[in-house]
Amino acid sequence: MLKIALESLGCSKNLVDAEIMMGILNNKGYKLIGDFEEADVIIVNTCGFIESAKQESIDTIINFAELKKTGNLKLLIVTGCLAQRYSEELKTEIPEIDAIVGTGSYQNIDKILKELSEIHQIVSLNDIEFVFNEDLPRYISTPSYMAYLKIGEGCSNNCTYCIIPKLRGKYRSRKFEDIIKEAKKLAESGVKELVVIAQDTTKYGFDLYGKERLSELLEELAKIDGFKWIRVMYSYPESITEELIQVIKKYDNICSYFDMPIQHASNNILKLMNRKTTKEDILNKINLIRSNIPDAILRTTIIVGFPGETEDDFKQLVDFVEEVKFDRLGAFAYSREEDTPADRLPNHIDEEVKIQRRDTLMMIQQKISEELNDKKIGKTYEVLIEEQIEDNVYTGRTQGDAEEIDSIVYVKSVDNLEVGEFVSVQINDAMEYDLMGDVLYELA
């Protein structure tokens, strides 16, 4: 039987697609391996969101294509957003690719693999309105204690800078019962941290049920035995309701963590971005969250250098960040994407100015983060242990930190700790982003 290796690039939503492909292939008897040098088949699940992601995807494909000459590689399959967006270019420019599979076709990966024995090159770009369901097998690739739960696909927000609606289609929610069924299986498998994802989690349900139902969904997830942390990602500020805040406040196993991409704080730029909110509305929402959950962790992402961004627009953004003091913030220089409305806007910003503004904002955030971390010294936090880095020293995360994108805690312990266990840690030192502490005791 063929040996298959899969490389998934980009976001966690893309990773879930990769896990479904691996689940389908595993069920069909193919051998999944991690050694690309030994693989008969390599699948590259690509990202095509911004220029740097596209370049990473192309570089990865080209590097793997070399294994057709130097390794065991027989078939190279490209899936995901780059495949959906640039199928013809990939077919022409990289002839080593044997199959190009779009975002609405990955569920047919086993059939495509079988067809490749008869056809040299396949391009499969089916209807991108496909939504996976719980009946499709899934091969979880994350650590055994955590898993992603994708509750929807696509996006209908139509922000002017974003290509996702063209790559993934309009927003489609999964059925409520289907999500709960998958969540129960994940809990039974030993998952302790459940990370709820979609392009916009707060829009969940509006297309299927005529109203947003994230708060109801979280209530049902919170009642499932086994989940220690339930984390919600990608929540848009205009759809964070008081009802949702109260549900998060009510359940101890729902993290008081709000991943809320605001993108900007100048009303002029927000309008040009086609964001459905204003600076005043965002501030009111933040105050509503903090008045109900004083220790809530607020994470956001911001785009600087958007077309038409003046010095005054940027100053408004800086002032807003300094006023709000987000716990976590990622700033990105605007990436010009063809086939988006923003690409056609006048007054594009020079690359040097974009980078300078990004760096300025991140320096401000670094000081804010350091101030907030200093206040944590002497306090005790629940920490999920993720890795042992040396004798008696481990790294982990608090419930205020999402995997890979947020901060870590360096933990000292005289006793051996297990990866995936929760411990109580007293913080004794702090850096700009990370914390250090000692184990007080293990948690059940």
UniProtKB/Swiss-Prot annotation:
Q: Which InterPro entries match?
A: Elp3/MiaA/NifB-like_rSAM (IPR006638), Methylthiotransferase (IPR005839), Methylthiotransferase_CS (IPR020612), Methylthiotransferase_N (IPR013848), Methylthiotransferase_N_sf (IPR038135), NA-bd_OB-fold (IPR012340), Ribosomal_uS12_MeSTrfase_RimO (IPR005840), rSAM (IPR007197)
State where the protein is found: Cytoplasm
The record's PROSITE patterns line, in alphabetical order, gives: MTTASE_N, MTTASE_RADICAL, RADICAL_SAM, TRAM
The record lists the catalysed reaction(s) as: L-aspartate(89)-[ribosomal protein uS12]-hydrogen + (sulfur carrier)-SH + AH2 + 2 S-adenosyl-L-methionine = 3-methylsulfanyl-L-aspartate(89)-[ribosomal protein uS12]-hydrogen + (sulfur carrier)-H + 5'-deoxyadenosine + L-methionine + A + S-adenosyl-L-homocysteine + 2 H(+)
Classification via Pfam families = Radical_SAM, TRAM_2, UPF0004
PANTHER family cross-referenced by the UniProt entry = RIBOSOMAL PROTEIN S12 METHYLTHIOTRANSFERASE RIMO, RIBOSOMAL PROTEIN US12 METHYLTHIOTRANSFERASE RIMO
The molecule here is called: Ribosomal protein uS12 methylthiotransferase RimO
Q: Which organism is it from?
A: Clostridioides difficile (strain 630) (Peptoclostridium difficile)
